Regions:
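Histidine-/acidic-rich catalytic cores in large beta-rich domains
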Residues: 1-202
């Protein structure tokens, strides 16, 4: 796909040559649209701040974008023309720290535009995990967030109001990481419960 130059950039003496890509998330495409086909896979390559769309049936990368996200995690398909990317927004040039906050960047394939619908809430609530992290935009517009390194999961509305949050604090008062948290909306939850109830394991 003529993207070899991204693996070991010229002059990158500080990069991790043992892990030049660091694939940290894949998101299978479940439905056809004008921009992708069922069976395609979105991939997040953290080390080079790249998100790509791979088509296994042809072994081709059919779309890719490097930045504006930095050291991103967790790509989600929102609808038939938009994806969401959890942007860690980490500055590793001078200090290894998050600039201002994390954010969710939405890329619109139809308009070739990127916007940040929850930025006010991310800044207000100081959501800034340096590594990992995930998010899911819910059907009513709220967003579920895992702030992995600080052991916090929360639900936040479009205006940045936290509806609830959980901090993974143990009896010794230390806070431990959360990892791969999931939020199930009601319709999906009851669908799973129904399927489990109808399973015959004999």
């Amino acid at each position: 796909n003529n993207l070899e130059k991204l693996i070991f950039p010229v002059g990158n003496e500080y990069g991790d040559h043992n892990d030049p890509l660091h694939l940290n998330d894949i998101q299978p495409v479940l439905n056809d649209s004008k921009f992708w086909k069922r069976g395609d896979i979105f991939m997040s390559l953290k080390q080079i701040s790249l998100v790509l769309l791979y088509r296994p049936s042809t072994n081709k990368i059919i779309w890719h974008k490097q930045g504006p996200w930095v050291y991103q995690h967790d790509v989600d398909v929102i609808n038939d023309h938009q994806i969401a990317v959890f942007d860690n927004n980490r500055d590793d040039f001078l200090k290894s720290e998050v600039k201002d906050s994390n954010e969710i960047l939405v890329y619109d394939f139809e308009k070739d535009e990127i916007f940040s619908p929850y930025q006010i809430g991310f800044v207000k609530n100081e959501i800034k995990t340096p590594s990992q992290g995930l998010s899911e935009i819910l059907s009513n517009g709220d967003v579920f967030i895992e702030e992995t390194d600080y052991g916090r999961i929360l639900r936040m509305d479009k205006n940045g109001k936290i509806k609830w949050q959980y901090i993974n604090r143990a009896k010794n008062l230390k806070i431990y990481r959360t990892s791969w948290s999931r939020f199930l909306e009601e319709n999906l939850y009851y669908s799973i419960v129904e399927k489990i109830a109808n399973v015959n394991c004999e």
